[in-house]
Amino acid sequence: MNEKKSFYVIGMSCAGCAANIQQALSERKGVIEARVNFAASDVIVEYNPTLVSDKDLQKTVQEAGYDLLLENETEPEQAEILQREAYDKLHRKTIGALLLSLPVFVIGMFFMHMPYGNWIMLGFTLPVLLVFGRDFFINAWRQLKHGHANMDTLVAVSTGVAFLFSLFNTLWPTYWTDRGLEAHIYYEAAAVIIALILLGRLLESRAKSNTSTAIRKLIGLQPKEVIRILEDGTEQVIPIKAVQPGDILLVKPGDKIPVDGSVTEGVSFVDESMITGEPVPVEKVTGTHVYTGTINQKGSFKFMAEKVGSETILAQIIKMVQEAQGSKAPVQQLVDRIAAIFVPAVIGIAALTFIGWMIAGGELAFTHALLTSVTVLVIACPCALGLATPTAIMVGIGKGAENNILIRDAQSLEQLCKVQAVVLDKTGTITEGKPVVTDIFWNPGIDLRHSMEVLLFMESRSEHPLADAVVLHLTEEGIKTNLKGEFNSLTGQGIQGMINGESYFVGNRRLLEMNGISRESKQAEQADACSLEGKTVVYFADSKQVLALIVIADRMKPGAVKAIERLQAEGIEVYMLTGDNRITARAVADSIGLKHFKAEVMPSDKADFVKELQQQGKIVAMAGDGINDSQALAQADVSIAMGKGSDIAIDVAKITLITSDLNAIPKAWALSKQTVAAIRQNLFWAFIYNLIDIPLAAGILYPCCGFLLNPMIAAAAMAFSSVSVVTNSLRIKAKKILFQFLNLNFQLLGNHSEV
C-alpha cells in the first residue's frame, strides 16, 4: 500500500531548486509522485514503502544538493524553529552586507578617483562576498557538481565575474592603461548585488511566512500539556505526545480539548466554532463527544481519549490543508517546465550577450560585454515565476481554512470559479435534514390535554422518523403520559392504538379512508394549503372524527435563500434535487427563490442528472452530505461535502464545508475567484518582467539611445519582482470574501422551472 508524506526541505533558494528536487525524487524507484512547494519549503511524496524508505528519499535529496527533515525528526514546531533560525541568519547577513556595501557604493559612484579608493572598496567587498554572500557560491558549486544550475548560480557567476574583473584591474591596471583604455572597477556592483539580493530574500522570506499562518493557527489549537487522571484518582501533568487511547483526562474551564474523546464525568459547555463554524457553545454531558482544539467554557469535566495524534479531526484538517497547499494548479505544470530550463537559458543568453558585444561593441566592447552579461545574469528571476502560483494557492487555501472551507487540492480551487451550474441536494443541504412540527390544528371542543397525552403515547412507540418530531414537540410543551394500551403499526398508512376501549389513529389520509373517518371541510382546506407549501400533514383521529392536523416540515437553513440569491446573481444556475413530489418540490423552490428544480429523484439518478448538465457543456458543482450523494459528487467537476463535527466527510469531496451554513458555497466561489485572479496577475507580471528586463539588460536600447542598465539597478529590480509577487498573493488574506450584486431583481414566487 502506498504512503503519502510531507517533508520539510532544507537548502532551496529558488524555483529551480524545487524543480531539481522534484526531478530527482520522481526518478527514484518506488516514488509514485513528488510535489515540491518552494513557497512552503516542503515536498509531498507518494511512494511505495516496500521499494523505498524515508532514509532513501533523504539520501536522494542530499545527492541533489539539498536535505530533508524526516518525519520522526520534525514536528511542525521543529520546522518552524528551523525557519525562524534561517530567517534570523538571513537577517544578520543582510544587515552586514548592507552596512559594508554602502561605503563601496558611495565611493564607486561618487569618489571613484579618490586615493586608494579601489583598495578601500576591495577591503569592504571581500567580506560581503566571502562572509555574507558565501552561501551563493557554496550552493552554486554544489549545484554544478550535480549538473544543475539555480538562482544561486546566476548570482555567483555575475558577482564573481564582476569581482574578479575588478580585482584584476586593481592589481594590474596597466594592462588597460598601456593600451589607452581605462581600468574599470565594479566592486560596487558585486557588493550591492549581494546586499540587495539578500534584502530581497529577507523580504520574500517574511512575506512567505505569512502565507502559512493558517497552518500555524490550526497547530496552535492543540495544547502542549494535559492533565491525566490516574487509577487512584491523582492528577498527573503529561505532554500531549504521551496521551494514549483509553486515558482519562481532566479539562478545566478555559482549557483547550487536547484530543478527541467522550465525556465520562461532569457537565460543561464547549466552544466548537473552529470545527462547526457555529458560535453558540455546545452542552457536554456524559457520553457526548469532544474534539481537539475546541475550548471548554465554565464547567470542568473528565473524558476518555479515543483518537490521538494523527487520528484526531484537527490533525486530519491540518493534513488536508497542508496537502492542499502543496498541490499544484494545472497552470503550475507549465511554469515548472519553464523554471527547470530558466537558469540554463539565462546563462546562454548572457553568453550570447557577451559574444555579441565583443563582436559589435567597438572601442568599449569588453567593458560593455562584461557589464551587460553580468546585468542579464542578475536581473533574470525564476523566483517570481516559481512563486506566482504556489503563494496564491497557499494563501487562498489557508484563507478558506480560516473560514471553515477545507479545499483538498489546487485544481478544485482553480476550477470552482469557472462553475456554471451548482446542484444542491435538498435534504441536509438546503434544509436542516431534521423534520420538526410547525403547527398542530386541534379540533375545537375536544379534551385537549387527554388528546395530547394519547398522541404522545402512540408516537413514542412508533418507529417512523416523523414520530420523533411529534414526541419532541409534545415534550417541549410539557406533556407527559402514563397511559397504557395496545399499539399496532400499519405499513404505508400509520399507526393504530387502543386506549380504555377507544381506537385512535395517527397517519396519512389513506388511513382515515380505510377506517371510514372523514375530514371536516375546514380541515381539508388546511391540509391542502399546507401541502401546497411543501409541508407534510399527519392526521390524529379517533374512531369518529379527526382530532388534529399535525403539520411537519423540514426547515430551511437560515442562509439558504441568501446563498442561492448570491449564486444566481453571479449568473450561476442553481438546481435542487429532491425525492419529494412535484407539488412539494415546487413549493420549496418558490419559498427560497430557486429557478430550477427536479422532483422525484432517486439517489441513483443524481449522478445521471449531473452528467446531463455536463453533456450540455456546463461545468458543474455538486453539493451534498458527502455520503449518500457520493456517486453524484464523484461525477461532478467540483464536489462539495456539507458537514460539521464528527460528520465531516473529508475524503469524500474535493471541498468540505465544515459549517452547515449554505453561504459557505458562494464564499468558496468568491475565494476561488480571488485566488485565480491573483495567480493570473502574478504570472502576467512575472513573465512580463523577464520578457522586458532581460532584453533591456542585454543592451537592446543602446544603439538608439545609449542606455545601459546598471547591474545594481538590475539587482534591485530582481528582488522587487519576487517580493511583489508574494505581496500580491497576500492581498487575498486582507480581502474579505465579499460579493457584489448589481442586479438583484429576483421574483421569489413563480420564477422557476422544473428540469
Model-derived segments and spans:
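Flexible metal-binding regulatory segments at protein termini and peripheral loops
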Residues: 1-116, 217, 232-237, 315, ...
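Conserved cytosolic catalytic loops of P-type ATPases
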Residues: 29-51, 55, 187, 216-311, ...
